[in-house]
């Protein structure tokens, strides 16, 4: 018996030694006020807000890639649209029995006006430089064909004219007028085809990667900010004092682990946010699951083609298609050089990030979310059918889709590029078991000490208002103080007000942001 106990003791020591050594390797690197997980547009926007509102707070940003803005915020990994609902038809669903509801469109438009104000403030204060490096005026155009779709577009246009935010939008079903707007879309098209389009001159193309890089660069100038690159978060645990310990591995240094203790943690890690939120153990995380959808685009850099198209042209999504899958032919501007993108074409991978793991989807399935995910799969057959049809597309199919928007396109001018991954949010629902949430959602603990952003569209273009909502949710008492109120109104002059219906305020804000960012401006006039 003694020999057996001795053997057991020795075995315990042998097994425990590496674990003890591993624990020793986890050195509490520091204590900080805020940890931002992920180096994308969301974390950088929140970080800049906090540096303005509470400059004495220390902030650490942890990013697994070797630079910031390398995942979803990277310019090539998203459509680069300044989502204002000027052309995105999915924000104004058809209603054959009555007037079209534009409430969601108004919400999106108001949100982007906040982003424009946030960026303008950063330009004025030297945080962002050279606005044309990250935002440019590109007209936003909706283009449809067929009796049903053209009638819908006219009804949509009529409904939107009741809002002051859409004054300046033009509607046409005249082929010659539309050809002036987008010649490539019209050349080679069947003259008998019934078509219609709307055009909003004050649309934008945005490089969110450039914004992110500039925001983080400015944050790095502050002594109480630290950026940890090549650092992958492995665990998030609540401490007895309600602070959080964030464990991360240094991917360039033998995966040595370090721990940062923080009072507040924001998980802005794109597709990885769900799994990291689950690691935190907060009960709110149990309500959510996720399903990844990837994207590909056809690209041309042929200058003879590119110079003849200066617009973002959005069509109508297929039945059951997620918002990110609305087909569009876009002018994009990278480092001052325009290119054309067409897509996206949905792809499937079980990765939650472009540079993620094939085990991401399986690893996110828990006892709490397996049934909601199953219900969503069963209740959204149109979406499943759409994704299958997209995955089955070959080069000829993709090119045929392009020719619906650019009839004279030639295959040799275009190449296929892989964009980023998006994780569509699935939320537990008492009535349906589970529902697919197609927007973005802030999830936070009851005490507001940890929060995550889940979801996809409209995403980056509304980073400023989304992070403003997060501040109001998790720092409610701080936001109510005169100091924070004053600073927020300085950053976002329209803070707390709606622009819709307020012509004077709309003109004041749009004139200010247009002049600061170097964008086209249309004065809103009374009817």
Swiss-Prot record:
GO terms for biological process: tricarboxylic acid cycle. It catalyses: (S)-malate + a quinone = a quinol + oxaloacetate. Gene3D superfamilies: D-Amino Acid Oxidase, subunit A, domain 2, FAD/NAD(P)-binding domain. Coiled coil: none annotated. GO terms for molecular function: 2-hydroxyglutarate dehydrogenase activity; L-malate dehydrogenase (quinone) activity. The keyword Protein transport does not apply. Pathway: Carbohydrate metabolism; tricarboxylic acid cycle; oxaloacetate from (S)-malate (quinone route): step 1/1. Its EC number is 1.1.5.4. Its cofactor is FAD. Pfam families: Mqo (PF06039). Keywords: FAD, Flavoprotein, Oxidoreductase, Tricarboxylic acid cycle. It comes from the Bacteria. SUPFAM superfamilies: FAD/NAD(P)-binding domain (SSF51905). Belongs to the MQO family. NCBIfam families: mal_quin_oxido, PRK05257.1-1, PRK05257.1-4, PRK05257.2-1, PRK05257.2-4, PRK05257.2-5, PRK05257.3-2, PRK13339.1. This is Probable malate:quinone oxidoreductase.
């Amino acid at each position: 018996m003694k020999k057996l106990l001795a053997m057991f003791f020795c075995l315990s020591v042998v097994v425990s030694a590496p674990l003890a050594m591993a624990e020793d390797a986890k050195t509490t690197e520091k204590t900080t006020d805020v940890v931002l997980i992920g180096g994308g547009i969301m974390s950088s926007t929140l970080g800049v807000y906090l540096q303005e509102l509470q400059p004495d707070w220390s902030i650490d940003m942890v990013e697994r890639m070797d630079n910031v803005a390398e995942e979803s915020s990277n310019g090539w990994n998203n459509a680069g649209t300044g989502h204002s609902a000027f052309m995105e038809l999915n924000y104004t669903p058809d209603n054959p029995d009555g007037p079209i509801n534009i409430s969601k469109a108004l919400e999106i438009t108001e949100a982007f006006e906040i982003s424009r104000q946030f960026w303008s403030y950063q330009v004025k204060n030297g945080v962002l430089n050279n606005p044309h490096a990250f935002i440019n005026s590109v007209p936003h155009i909706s283009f449809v064909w067929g009796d049903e779709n053209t009638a819908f577009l006219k009804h949509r246009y009529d409904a939107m004219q009741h809002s002051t935010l859409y004054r300046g939008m033009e509607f046409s079903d005249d082929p010659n007028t539309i050809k002036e707007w987008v010649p490539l879309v019209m050349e080679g098209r069947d003259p008998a085809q019934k078509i219609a389009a709307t055009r909003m001159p004050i649309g934008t193309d945005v490089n969110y990667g450039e914004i992110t890089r500039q925001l983080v660069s400015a944050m790095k100038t502050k002594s109480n900010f630290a950026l940890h690159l090549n650092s992958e978060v492995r665990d998030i645990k609540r401490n007895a004092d309600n602070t959080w310990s964030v464990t991360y591995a240094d991917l360039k240094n033998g995966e040595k682990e370090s721990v940062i203790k923080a009072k507040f943690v924001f998980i802005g890690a794109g597709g990885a946010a769900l799994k990291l939120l689950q690691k935190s153990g907060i009960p709110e995380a149990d309500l959510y699951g996720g399903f990844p959808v990837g994207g590909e685009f056809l690209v041309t850099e042929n200058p003879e083609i590119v110079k003849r198209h200066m617009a973002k042209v959005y069509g109508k999504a297929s039945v059951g298609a997620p918002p990110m899958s609305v087909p569009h032919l876009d002018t994009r501007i990278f480092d001052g050089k325009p290119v054309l993108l067409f897509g996206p074409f949905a792809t499937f991978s079980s990765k939650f990030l472009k540079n993620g793991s094939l085990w991401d989807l399986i690893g996110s399935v828990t006892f709490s979310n397996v049934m909601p995910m199953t219900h969503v799969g069963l209740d959204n057959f149109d979406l499943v059918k759409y994704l299958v049809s997209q995955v089955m597309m070959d080069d000829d199919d993709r090119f045929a889709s392009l020719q619906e928007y650019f009839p004279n396109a030639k295959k040799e001018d275009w190449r296929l590029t892989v964009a980023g991954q998006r994780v569509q949010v699935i939320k537990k629902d008492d009535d349906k078991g589970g529902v697919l949430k197609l927007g973005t959602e802030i999830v936070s603990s009851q005490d507001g000490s940890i929060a995550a952003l889940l979801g996809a569209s409209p995403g980056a273009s509304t980073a400023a208002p989304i992070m403003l909502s997060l501040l109001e949710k998790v720092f409610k008492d701080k936001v109510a103080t005169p100091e924070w109120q004053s600073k927020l109104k300085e950053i976002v002059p329209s803070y707390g007000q709606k622009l819709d219906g307020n012509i004077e305020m709309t003109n004041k804000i749009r004139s200010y942001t247009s002049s600061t960012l170097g964008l086209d401006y249309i004065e809103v006039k009374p009817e």
